Amino acid sequence: MQAYISISFSKRKELEKEVQAIKNALQKCGVSGFVFVDEYQFSAKQEKKMMQKAMEDVEKSAILIAEVSEKGIGIGIEVGYAKAKNIPVIYVRNSKSEHSTTVSGIADFRVIYENEIDLEEKLEKILKTLSVSFKPHQTRTN
């Protein structure tokens, strides 16, 4: 089972500790973390291919974790797509970062953290409550 970790492409390196904390919490709950921006590289001319692949990977995920300490348009698109597919969304941000009303407003759970240790602990608690209802997402076919 996988969790899609949605983060800002341009700020990925700055969020390394946070991404590792998210992956640690997921691992403790038997879920693998998938970071789209770490897995693929697309040229500017490949925008359709990029978005198609992102949607496919969101659909393969049991949950989506949106790290919005650094905002990004792509995060909002991925969150909206996950919600449209009935995939639970967890909103995650550092307490010192600006609040994202759109992502928070659509999220099923929220984690506001002080540091990566706090993030890992809070996220793990939410994941444990979700573990009872974790089911691999099934894509509908016509």
Per-region residue spans from a language model:
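Conserved catalytic or regulatory cores that recognize and/or transform ribose-phosphate-containing ligands
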Residues: 1-142
